[in-house]
Curated annotation (Swiss-Prot):
Family note: Belongs to the HrcA family.
HAMAP family from the UniProt entry: HrcA (MF_00081)
One of the record's GO molecular function terms: DNA binding
Name of the protein in its database record: Heat-inducible transcription repressor HrcA
Keywords of this entry: Repressor, Stress response, Transcription, Transcription regulation
Lineage: Bacteria, Bacillati, Actinomycetota, Actinomycetes, Mycobacteriales
GO terms of biological process kind: negative regulation of DNA-templated transcription
Species per Swiss-Prot/TrEMBL record: Mycolicibacterium vanbaalenii (strain DSM 7251 / JCM 13017 / BCRC 16820 / KCTC 9966 / NRRL B-24157 / PYR-1)
Pfam families per record: HrcA (PF01628)
InterPro entries: GAF-like_dom_sf (IPR029016), HrcA (IPR002571), HrcA_C (IPR021153), WH-like_DNA-bd_sf (IPR036388), WH_DNA-bd_sf (IPR036390), WHTH_transcript_rep_HrcA_IDD (IPR023120)
Record's function text: Negative regulator of class I heat shock genes (grpE-dnaK-dnaJ and groELS operons). Prevents heat-shock induction of these operons.
């Protein structure tokens, strides 16, 4: 790339930085005064004319200033040399805040609230998808001799509790035996395989007396928990941040809010995140959702030990602090995976 092209990109970068900071169209005089480009205002004006002709910036109204287009933001993001680094103290504070979560729900609620505060945008976190989960542990607790509490804990930290009513009561020895049988069938297996294994166990013991009835009743409840509990869940935080930037959406804020409420569009975008640590930036029409026009989505996946648990990210107007937001999304995702993987 020639020096003129490099200089024009520096002009574009200055326009993006100043427009994000001020919300005002940027003129050549302001660029020369604020940025040490080493060229005259006339040269900057010529560069801006080329950038406008190529579709990177546009003139919003009669103002002499220019603002970035979606194409301009994309060029800026694609050529980011440095993402704003977070200090060690900031990283430790994030990790400590997330580690204080008492369970999966609390960790994810803390994560979405923290990400919204850090970025001043809407934060979204997808609950771990059950299809990729394995059963870490099964607890069987006798509430009464004929009433059991089954607690299924997945490797992502998800906890499901179910009550089983038995036909006949069981004693402590039978309870331990039941726990061992069910645990052997379930633990360490993906949810689909675990449901098959516990069903096979019930079929094998059917009609043999002893614990067969207790196993059969428990298996029915467990299969419902493992297979039928398939809804996708999404946590949102910071929706009030959208109202601070109403003008940036060009009248499309209502459709963005409706998309957030319905969740389908956002879940589809997050489902595309298949690699933890890789941050994706979708700008405007790159979201491929009409209701999200004028919106940028910065997303990644979170997980542990090479396994993806779910997607997360932020969305807001295209006029966004991309370097800072990318860094925050990456850091929070990293620490969610670390916290959940250690539980």
């Amino acid at each position: 790339m020639g020096s003129a092209d490099d200089r024009r990109f520096e002009v574009l970068r200055a326009i993006v930085a100043d427009f994000v900071a001020t919300k005002e169209p940027i003129g050549s005089k302001a660029i020369v005064e604020r940025h040490n480009l080493g060229v005259s205002s006339a040269t900057v004006r010529n560069d801006m004319a080329v950038l406008e002709a190529e579709g990177y910036i546009t003139q919003p109204h009669t103002s002499s200033g220019r603002v970035p287009t979606e194409k301009g933001y994309r060029e800026f993001v694609d050529r980011l040399q440095d993402v704003k680094p977070m200090s060690g103290a900031e990283r430790r504070a994030i990790l400590q805040f997330l580690e204080s979560g008492v369970d999966l729900d609390d960790v994810l609620r803390r994560a979405v609230r923290l990400l919204a505060q850090l970025t001043r945008q809407v934060a979204v976190v997808q609950y771990p998808t059950l299809t990729t989960s394995t059963v870490r542990r099964l607890e069987v607790v006798a509430l009464t001799p004929a009433r059991l509490l089954l607690v299924v804990i997945t490797d992502t930290g998800r906890v499901d509790q179910r009550i089983v009513e038995l036909g006949d009561g069981i004693d402590d020895g039978q309870l331990a035996q039941l726990r061992d049988m069910l645990g052997s069938a379930l633990e360490g297996k993906p949810l689909a395989a675990a449901s098959v294994a516990v069903s096979d166990l019930a079929v094998h013991l059917n009609g043999q007396g002893g614990l067969a009835d207790a196993v059969g009743r428990s298996a029915t409840v467990l299969v419902e928990t493992l297979v039928e509990h398939t809804e996708e869940r999404l946590l949102l935080g910071g929706t009030a941040n959208l109202t601070r930037n109403t003008a940036d959406f060009g009248g499309s804020l209502r459709s963005v809010l409706e998309a957030l409420e319905e969740q389908v569009v956002v879940l589809r975008l997050l489902a595309k995140q298949q690699e933890a640590g890789k941050v994706t930036v979708r700008i405007g029409h790159e979201t491929e959702a009409e209701e999200m026009a004028g919106t940028s989505v910065i997303s990644t996946a979170y997980g542990s030990a090479g396994k993806v648990f779910g997607g997360m990210g932020v969305l807001g107007p295209t006029r966004m602090d991309y370097p800072g937001t990318i860094a925050n999304v990456a850091a929070v995702a990293l620490y969610i995976g670390e916290v959940l993987g250690n539980r």
